[in-house]
Amino acid sequence: MNIYESDKLLAEYLLFHYGSAEEILPYEFGPRKALEYPARCVSENLTASGRALDLGCAVGRSAFELARTCFEVIGIDFSRRFIEAANALKTADLPYLRADEGDRTTPLIARVPAGIERTRVSFEVGDAMNLRADIGVFDVVLMANLIDRLSEPLRCLARLPDLVKPGGQLVITSPYTWLEDFTPRANWLCPALDGLRTALALDFDLVSTRDLPFLIREHARKFQWSVAQATVWIRR
């Protein structure tokens, strides 16, 4: 079974995307600058408007954030469970259970922030390495924490020149956690920034890089603290 179809990962990602600081990290200490990562992927990297694509959208928070300034946003993820949750959040709040300890849980509510025009966003199940031919072109493409979960990263990158309009923005964020569970070793881009530069050099200019910390809570006393590298590219 794909772990991204499991109840455990669905609940973790709903908390990661929509949980409050207190719901995720109820301690006085801890890496608070790592919270709100799906929103920061947009707010700290993009001056976005027009039509946007969120590849690997998970349960949708970044796609909704893009809708603050973009008139149309398409979110695509390979996980059917994630897309079902994102679509449910277009029209209603979504209850879920946060893992605390063992089988002890706390009921929480995932809620899209106020002020977002949710009708601008659509979600669909899809493969980032094999997108439908009629998806069109975009002013903004976001790929957050996706590249190291693809079996053929270069296949996905090769499609990007056809997806981003000239002058459009591409943002790729990733902690580059290469695992053979997802990507055959021969397909790892190591070092990743060099691999991205080589793959995108003919069509994109790299305009900035920055470090973006993020925090995923597994249970009350176990967290994944990671640092993604965000690269911003402009289509020639």
PLM region spans:
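A short acidic, Gly/Pro-enriched loop at the edge of an enzyme's catalytic core
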Residues: M129-V141
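Conserved SAM/SAH-binding beta-strand->alpha-helix loop
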Residues: S79
